[in-house]
């Protein structure tokens, strides 16, 4: 069964694209068949994270009816497949975002996981992505503006009868001014399923166009993303460690 999961936030800059790219890698490392989709048509960045931002055929071409969906799908060297969006504003002309839901149905049965990144905010582009997904994974930073926007996204998703599987609290620093996990859970009325700490290695990995789990697999953020991927796939970690050799052994064990 294919799980189509939209990584959504309501607010830009909280790290949902970074999380999407790293989950695609992590789930693939765990032996899952993954397709990542950049459904952010106006300001796409997922291709930049993957080093595949100059693809000749994109989701915009599919939404214009120019090509079939499979013609805009590429296999990344890390093993997952990727459907990019064009970074050129000229390619927005003639795009029918209302077709996104039907287009995404074409991926049913072709992967274990379809991970969608989408535009920030709650405009038609973002709501079309919500409509096209089966499940929603919220991402927020531990501050009130981020959580408030995540709440708006949650309300839209609930209005469409979408299953919100949880919220990821990203870039935590352990500071007194941050909203606590209990407060975030109470405000959003969804479980907090991961806390990813602020980690300077994440910015370095983005610049290198490599997932943090590949670039610095022993970093705190990489370990938490692996835990999240394991939780999404229903796997249980035997142990937890920031030691790279132990982390690799965990991945190898879970792929059996």
Question: Where are the language model's segments positioned?
Answer:
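Residue-level signature of catalytic and energy-coupling elements of molecular machines
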Residues: 12, 17, 38, 62, ...
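NTP-binding/hydrolysis catalytic cores, primarily Walker-type P-loop NTPases
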Residues: 212-256
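P-loop/Walker-type NTP enzyme "switch/lid" segment
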Residues: 36-109, 206-208, 214
